[in-house]
Amino acid sequence: MPSSTFSGTVSTPKLSVAVDMGNPFLNLTVDAFLKIGAVGVTKSLAEDTYKAIDKGSLSKSTLEHALKKLCKEGVYWGAAGGVYIGTEYGIERIRGSRDWKNAMLAGAATGAVLSAVGKKGKDTIVIDAILGGALATASQFVNNHYFY
C-alpha cells in the first residue's frame, strides 16, 4: 500500500507545499484543492474584513457567519481547482500531449460540472461550460506566452 506524506517549506515570499499520495493524479488534485482552496479562503476573508470595517461593528454572530463562509468558499474553490486539474491531467494522459486544447476541454468540463451541481438550468450549464473553457484557454495562452 502506498504511503502518503505531507511536507511544506516557507521562504520569503513563497510558500511551498508538497503532497505525495503515491499517485500523480491524486497528488495534482489534492495539491490543487489545497492551493486554490486557500485562494478562496483568502478572498472570503478579505470580503468579510471589508464588510466588518464598513459596517463599523463586530459581533459573535458576524464572526460565526464569516467563519462558516470561509469554510464553504475554501471547499468550493478547492473542489473547482481539483476538478479542473484532475480533468486536465486525465485529458493530457489520454491525448498524449500538453497544450491549450487540454485546458479548454478541462475548463469546459469543470464549468459544466460546477454549474450542474449548482442546480441551474441546462442553458446556464452550457454557458458556464463555454465560459470555463474560454477562461482556461486564455489562462493557458498567457502562461505559455503564446501572444509573443
UniProtKB/Swiss-Prot annotation:
Compartment annotation: Plastid, Chloroplast outer membrane; Plastid, Etioplast membrane
GO cellular component: chloroplast; chloroplast envelope; chloroplast outer membrane; etioplast membrane; peroxisome; plant-type vacuole; plastid; plastid outer membrane
Name of the protein in its database record: Outer envelope pore protein 16-1, chloroplastic
Activity regulation, free text: Stimulated by GTP.
Region (Contains 4 beta strands): 2-73
Induction (UniProt): Transient reduction upon de-etiolation (illuminated 5-day-old etiolated seedlings) (at protein level). Strongly induced by low-temperature stress and weakly in response to osmotic stress, salicylic acid (SA) and exogenous abscisic acid (ABA) treatments.
GN (gene name): OEP161
Pfam families according to UniProt: Tim17
Organism: Arabidopsis thaliana (Mouse-ear cress)
Biological process annotations from GO: monoatomic ion transport; protein import into chloroplast stroma; response to cold; response to glucose; response to jasmonic acid; response to sucrose; response to wounding
Primary role: Voltage-dependent high-conductance channel with a slight cation-selectivity; selective for amino acids but excludes triosephosphates or uncharged sugars. Non-essential amino acid-selective channel protein and translocation pore for NADPH:protochlorophyllide oxidoreductase A (PORA) and possibly PORB. Involved in PORA precursor (pPORA) import and thus confers photoprotection onto etiolated seedlings during greening.
